[in-house]
Amino acid sequence: MGWSCIILFLVATATGVHSHVQLQQPGAELVKPGASVKVSCKASGYTFTSYWMHWVKQRPGQGLEWIGRIHPSDSDTNYNQKFKGKATLTVDKSSSTAYMQLSSLTSEDSAVYYCAI
C-alpha cells in the first residue's frame, strides 16, 4: 500500500465584533492517516476571554458543520455529538490562542477548518 496523507486547510473568520479583530491560523497541515494534529487560532484586537471561540468544518462540496465551541475565560466547552472523541478544544489565555486537536485522522477529516467568534 502506498503512502497517503490527509490535508487540512485552516481558515479564520471573525464576524459581528469589531473590524480590527484578527484570528490567525496556519495555512495548511499535511498529516498521515491515524495520526493526530493540533491546530491553532491566535486572536487579537479584542478581549480573548469575553467571547466563545467556535470551530467549524467544511468538506469539499458540502455545507458547514459546527464542531464545537470553547469559552476562554473558564475553558467551558460544548461539542457537536458527532465530533466528541474526535476533536478536543483548548485555550491558552496567556497567548490568546485557541487550539483544536483532531485525533485518529482519516480521509473524512480532510477539510477546511474555520475558527470563528
Curated annotation (Swiss-Prot):
Lineage of source species: Eukaryota, Metazoa, Chordata, Craniata, Vertebrata
Superkingdom in the source lineage: Eukaryota
Positions of region (Complementarity-determining-2): 69-85
InterPro entries recorded: Ig-like_dom (IPR007110), Ig-like_dom_sf (IPR036179), Ig-like_fold (IPR013783), Ig_V-set (IPR013106), IgHV (IPR050199)
Region described as Framework-3: spans on this chain: 86-117
Record has Disulfide bond as a keyword: yes
GO biological process: immunoglobulin mediated immune response
Other facts: This germline gene belongs to a set of closely related genes that could encode V regions of NPb antibodies.
Cysteines engaged in disulfide bonds, as pairs: 41-115
Pfam families to which the protein is assigned, alphabetical: V-set
Name of the protein in question: Ig heavy chain V region 102
Cleavable signal peptide: 1-19
Location of region: Complementarity-determining-1: 50-54
A single MF term (Gene Ontology): antigen binding
Region annotation (Framework-1) ranges: 20-49
Organism: Mus musculus (Mouse)
Keywords: Adaptive immunity, Disulfide bond, Immunity, Immunoglobulin, Signal
GO cellular component, one term: immunoglobulin complex
Region (Framework-2) residue spans: 55-68
